Every structure is written in structure tokens, then in C-alpha cells.
Amino acid sequence: MKIILIIILILSFNYTKAQVKNQNNDFEAPLKIPLILSGTFGELRSNHFHSGIDFKTNQEIGIPIFSPASGYVSRIKVSPTGFGKAIYITHENGFTTVYAHLEKFNEEINQYIFDKQYALKQFSLDISIEKEKFKIQLGDTIGYTGNSGSSSGPHLHFEI
């Protein structure tokens, strides 16, 4: 009986893992600089829990942000508060990534937003984008880091 219990115990350790490593490598890094965090997921803020992670940009504005996977732009927000300029990308793997506090979007999206703001005669926007409008490939520049919205310094707010 003891031998059977020992065998079961040994076998159970072979089939359990505390964490399963992601074998798919679904995403690349959104920045081509060393990734240093200035804010972590779930940390307590003055009136909410932080919903993503913040990457430091060495106090620089305008560092290119790259799409970590292929997909399409599904939402764009522009506001003087909150996320400021933010872009949402829905990826082929079913995940959506969010990039916030941007200085600006890429040229094509910037022009689209500029035209929308003038057509609607308003600065603040929250637009759902049709799937075919802005196709994004892995590594495409989607915007540039900034300090827009309710931000205390240049950085990239990133969510998956």
C-alpha cells in the first residue's frame, strides 16, 4: 500500500506545474527600448486600481510604439483627461491591447482623428472603428509615447 501511495505521489508531481509557460509567444514588445515598469497592474491609485502596466520612457515623448501582433484598430479615444489619446487593437488571437497617454497616433490615424474632430466640432472622441478601416501588422508603428490625459509624466500605459 505504501508503495502505491509513493508512486501516486511521484507521478502527481510530474503532471503538475505552478505556471505553464506560454509556448505561443503571441506578442512582441510594444517598445524597442528596455522595458522598465513605472506602474504595475492592480496597484491602488487614488480612486481606482490600475488597469494595466506603465512602461518608462526616460521622460521622453515621441518614442515609436509598435503593434505586438497583427490585427485591426477597434477603438480610438481622445480626451483631455483619463487615458488622453488611446488606441485599442483587436488581434487575430482574440486579445485586445490598449495603448494610452500617447502624444500622437501614426500618420493615417492622426489624419482620420483630425478630420473627425473637425467634422464633429469637438476635441474629445470615443470611436468604435469598423474592422476593415485600419489593418495592423506585427511591428507596424501605431503611435508615439506621450503624456496626454491624466498622466504625471511621459510613459506608455499598456493593457492586454
Map each language-model feature to its residues.
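Bacterial Sec-dependent N-terminal signal peptides
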Residues: M1-N25
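Surface-exposed, glycine-biased beta-strand/turn segments
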Residues: A18-T96, E103-F105, E132, Q137-L138, ...
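Short, charged/polar low-complexity linear motifs in solvent-exposed/disordered segments
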Residues: E92-N93, F114-Q117, L156
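Aromatic/His-enriched, Gly/Pro-containing loop or helix-boundary segments
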Residues: A100-L102, E107-L138
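Histidine-centered catalytic micro-motifs
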Residues: G153-I160
